[in-house]
Swiss-Prot record:
GO cellular component terms given for this protein: cell cortex; cytoskeleton
Name of the protein described by the UniProt record: Profilin-2
UniProt main location, coarse: cytoplasm
Localization in the cell: Cytoplasm, Cytoskeleton
The family this protein is said to belong to: Belongs to the profilin family.
Lineage: Eukaryota, Viridiplantae, Streptophyta, Embryophyta, Tracheophyta
Keywords tagged on the record: Actin-binding, Allergen, Cytoplasm, Cytoskeleton, Disulfide bond, Phosphoprotein
Residues spanned by motif Involved in PIP2 interaction: 84-100
Amino acid sequence: MSWQTYVDDHLMCDIEGHEGHRLIAAAIVGHDGSVWAQSATFPQFKPEEMNGIMTDFNEPGHLAPTGLHLGGTKYMVIQGEAGAVIRGKKGSGGITIKKTGQALVCGIYEEPVTPGQCNMVVERLGDYLLEQGL
């Protein structure tokens, strides 16, 4: 299965039980910041934004004072899982980033999708990739 298929079929799909509700953007990005696959709507990000995200996985709390920046958008960092998941909020939407052994699984949402639904979609794929040694 191609990385693009994972994005299209497992991240940009309808949320279970909520037909028509889906993430607004998603991507799988290598730890080095290289894009493995992304939706057409995923924002163009700067290398320093990805570096900040990777630093926060290695040093939890690093982004808390400044916020998480991706594609020029600033998200307030909210409760995540140290070293495993970073969550951010901006207005009625937000972002979830799950770290696997080799990649970051990223999902961005807006209402009517809830933070919990975004977490479920992103973390389910991230957990699967971890189980596969990726």
